[in-house]
Amino acid sequence: KNHGYTLSAIEEDGFEKIHQIDALGTDDSQKGISISYANTILKFADFWQNNSFDLVCCLGDRFEMSAAVQASIPFGVKLAHIHGGETTLGAIDNVYRHQITLASQLHFVSTLDYKKKVEELTGTLENIYDVGALSLDNIPNFQPIEKMSFLEAFQIKNEDYVLVTFHPETVAVDSNITYAKQMIAALAELTKMLNIVITMPNADTLGSVYRKQIYQLKKTHPGKIVLVENFGKVNYFYLYYQILI
């Protein structure tokens, strides 16, 4: 609910049996994220106790995914990690990603360099496959949707616009207050020339700092700012297809 009902996209793809685990709190401070991490481990301890699978696929580097994986280790769950070996600057994602890699038995990486990193982490050359980035397969198959239907669905004007996506700083966390103010000041200047479409922050440390500033910007410039919690894959691709900046 807090991030645009992304579960609906999974249901629309035809997946019927979806296990839902509610473990995340609304506090996105450092302590709040840590508590959410711990709660996720506790919830998944029950999940792994009551469910078994031949293979579990783990995508990426989210702290929620890391917590689920950590809970699986005592149960000997066989894991396949997608997008291991990568490096993220300005975020603590590397720690979560490498944790998942070390717990996994199969690895599907997106480049040869990332394959080498997984080899370093695991100490073996076995079961590491350079398959490329999975999302790239969606791009050649992308078909532009009808423009006016898209604009009406998200209440975007049929004019030039800027797309803004900002990930909170999760290494130097206290810098987010300054970064948020700088971002909003820059966007306020852009409203003099262009419309702005902002994708809202996700569940990362101090994402609420940006939300507060973004809501204030929207209040100050209601006719120039559009806020979107969840575009979904096709709509986000289309946004890039039409984008000015």
Model-derived features: positions:
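Conserved nucleotide-sugar phosphate-binding/catalytic loop shared by glycosyltransferases and other
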Residues: 1-36, 43
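Donor-nucleotide binding loops and adjacent catalytic segments primarily
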Residues: 7-10, 145-241
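Active-site proximal beta-strand in glycosyltransferases
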Residues: 71-85
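A nucleotide-sugar donor-handling region in carbohydrate enzymes
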Residues: 1-4, 103-178
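Short glycine/serine/threonine-rich phosphate/pyrophosphate-binding segments
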Residues: 62-69, 115
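Short N-terminal targeting/anchoring amphipathic segment
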Residues: 48-62
